[in-house]
Amino acid sequence: MEDYLEMLCRLCGTEGFTRVHLLAERLNVQPSSASKMVDGLKREGLVKAEKYGLLRLTPRGEEVGRYLLYRHGVLHRALCLLNHTESELEQTERIEHFIDRRTVENLARLLERYDLPPR
């Protein structure tokens, strides 16, 4: 569910809304799968569906989504620093679901020491 909310936050970022088919396309899933997950996010109070198939994040959805993007950025930068590459996306995607807030904040502080703020 976090991957969907993270992507919704990215997609809604510029215009404030997105659509299920764009979400499905970006996550490389079927629109029906994305629609089911959006239903779950709606039940959690993170997303609201509007007329014409528009999806918008609720204030709570925005808050959680922004944290997920932050966590992703911190972890990705830390892995890139450790491995000296920019291709750590797969590892980031795997690890980010198991890392707690305290660890994220500690990694962010460590990155600041190296003058590498999270993106």
Regions found by a protein language model. Name each.
Residues 1-29:
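N-terminal helix-turn-helix DNA-binding core of bacterial DNA-binding proteins
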